[in-house]
Amino acid sequence: MAHYKAADSKREQFRRYLEKSGVLDTLTKVLVALYEEPEKPNSALDFLKHHLGAATPENPEIELLRLELAEMKEKYEAIVEENKKLKAKLAQYEPPQEEKRAE
């Protein structure tokens, strides 16, 4: 009997945890949205995944990292372009490959 109460207590703690963290509310909202869909999707699981993924608030750090990534990509492209120009400029001052081999 004591084992049964311990398991029940653990379940109750877990239920409260899910409730406090907003999991139950979010799951309920997504399931209600699926229920209210006029045309049910072919994959209910994909529907849930899509809506649960969209339900999480965007972390501000993620947005900052996205912006930083975009900036770094631009800088990278500029550096690659500059590198091409410098190689072309350098090639003007270097002797052709045949002259190098003769030396």
From Swiss-Prot:
Any one annotated GO CC term: nucleus
Coiled-coil zones: none
The protein's name: c-Myc-binding protein
Classification lineage: Eukaryota, Metazoa, Chordata, Craniata, Vertebrata
Keywords: Cytoplasm, Mitochondrion, Nucleus, Transcription, Transcription regulation
Family affiliation: Belongs to the AMY1 family.
Quaternary structure note: Binds via its C-terminal region to the N-terminal region of MYC. Associates with AKAP1/S-AKAP84. Interacts with MYCBPAP. Interacts with CFAP91.
UniProt-listed GO biological process terms: regulation of DNA-templated transcription; spermatogenesis
PANTHER family: ASSOCIATE OF C-MYC AMY-1, C-MYC-BINDING PROTEIN
Organism field: Homo sapiens
Domain of life where this protein originates: Eukaryota
Cited function: May control the transcriptional activity of MYC. Stimulates the activation of E box-dependent transcription by MYC.
Tissue: Highly expressed in heart, placenta, pancreas, skeletal muscle and kidney. Also present at low levels in lung.
Example of a GO MF term: transcription coactivator activity
Main location: cytoplasm
